[in-house]
Amino acid sequence: MAEQKAKVVHGPGPRGMGGPRPKVENPGKLLKRIMDEVFKHYLPHCILVLVCIIVSALANVQASLFLKTLIDDYIVPMTKQATPDFGPLAGALVRIGCIYAIGVLAAWLNARIMVNVTQGTLRNLRVQLFTHMESLPIRYFDSHPHGDIMSVYTNDVDTLRQMISQSIPQLVSSAITIVSVFTSMCLMSWQLTVVTMLMVALMLFCSKKITSMSGKYFVAQQKDLGKVNGYIEEMMEGQKVVKVFTHEQKALDGFRQLNDKLKESAKQANNYANIIMPVTAQLGNTSYAVCALAGAAMAVGNVGGMTLGTVMAFLSLNKGFNMPISQVSMQANSVIMALAGAERIFKMMDETSEADEGYVTLVNVKYGKDDELVETTERTGIWAWKHPHHDGTTTYHKLAGDITFTDVDFGYVPEKTVLHGINLYGRPGQKIAFVGSTGAGKTTITNLINRFYDIADGKIRYDGINIRKIKKDDLRRSLGIVLQDTHLFTGTVMENIRYGRLDATDEECIAAAKLANADGFVKRLPDGYNTMLTNDGANLSQGQRQLLAIARAAVADPPVLILDEATSSIDTRTEALVQRGMDGLMYGRTSFVIAHRLSTVRNADCIVVLEQGRIIERGSHDELIAKRGKYYQLYTGNLAEN
């Protein structure tokens, strides 16, 4: 079971911060897109950062080169003087101190600017990402695990932060340092430069060899880590079941088995990875020692004009050459990993937004002369569909709540149709109830009314208007929906009710709560309507959460209600309380109701019985009971279960 829920976890690996390099399509295109996001708002900052990096790198090289002058022109001559004059030496030390200070100041300024650039870019990217996510169709969220979407906001954005703030600046700095140091070393001594390059080649060869040996073990480590995380998540979600059946020891044994396997794979992987740094460090020290011995021999033999100052300057450059070489490999891998995260970010941003070809809008109206509908900005409680025409004229059609399905076919995927030839209607003020077995298509029909999905064939009309012509926002504003899975947001009770209509007053929210019969329990909460709700309203019972969801729908005062199994998870006493409130809420409104407890739909104007996506019966409760068909079986079976 844990294996089925295991998630891919990106963790550290042998290549600096991440094991085997992920495969990325079009890395150049991705990198350009990232840099375009950065340069769009921070191009002057980036130019200043580049200047700081160049100044810092050249200051370090210049400081190393100054050692030759310091030793050959100041220290060595002073050793031959009977009474050394320290004045020139002090001046030289001040100059080298200034060089170091300039390098440090440039590095500090670079770091400060990059913090601003990085955080600003990520802020803009998160806003774009969230804005686009809000425009995606429900189908996207149905087909993508929520954990994967969250991972884009957390893991992938964080790897991008590391790349922008650290990896790219260090790569640029390393490249400038390598070029400037290599040029300086060649000008000083080509012989010692050859020795240095041979040791660097050996260093890179050893690193690549060790990395290739550890790669397969890091793949195993990532898989085992995913299994452990999946098992922990599964046990957390099923903790009540574990305790009810007293399977704590069994759960612990299962965890130990997976944890031991993770330990072994991680140990094998890190046995190799942990020796990369010591090996490269020792090879760097070896390069330093070899150059020191060779340089000393050349200086003693006066080969190629080698002096003590030249040897010391070259050794300083040698030390500064090995470090950026190793950094390039590490930071290049970090960039590749960040590009893998960026690929997922941009893939989400490139998803097609929810299409909306509608042009009919919902507006407030009032009656003018001769009972003509006139659009107004006032909240009159009278709504109308504003229908612009090709000839430039506009007509207003009063919203009534008349919904009709004509020969509707639908499938969540093209190759599988789940609704077949659906014909039904809901007249203004009618209560239409959908019943049927699980998977019969009840919820699917309500999803089509609010255009969470678009139909494959047929027509759905709202007050005689094809709903494809109605803008989705306006269509959904005309609907009050209580979903099967109630979701409450972090905030006060009042704020959660007001979510149904953001401009609702406190009095209107309280009136909606009274209509939903939620006012009584809300007043008993510690702070009443100002009680804070967190963690999806975990401090409320399921029934109380359902009542608030109904109040949220009520405050919107919609002409059409969709109640998706609104009382399926409430106890009988609370159900009666809810039902009284719902009867008042549904009065005068077209209502589509789905309920497991068929006793709640007895008073429906029309009961529609669905089976395998087809309407097989319709009529009032008494009519369907008299037929002794599918509804009769469901109803009598439902009563027996209750």
Residue ranges and their predicted role:
Residues 77, 184-198, 268-343, 348-352, ...:
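Helix-loop-helix
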Residues 32, 51, 106, 110, ...:
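Hydrophobic alpha-helical transmembrane segments of ABC transporter permease domains
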Residues 41, 45-58, 166-220, 293-306:
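Transmembrane helices of ABC transporter permease
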Residues 1-60, 75-96, 110-114, 118, ...:
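Membrane-integrated ABC transporters
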Residues 13-22, 119, 127-151, 155-157, ...:
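Short intracellular "coupling" helices and adjacent cytoplasmic loop segments at the cytosolic face
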Residues 82-83, 365-642:
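ABC-type nucleotide-binding domain
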Residues 40-43, 138-139, 155-164, 168, ...:
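An intracellular "coupling" helix at the cytosolic face of ABC transporter transmembrane type-1 domains
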Residues 20-28, 51-52, 59-75, 99-146, ...:
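Juxtamembrane helix-loop junctions of ABC transporter transmembrane domains
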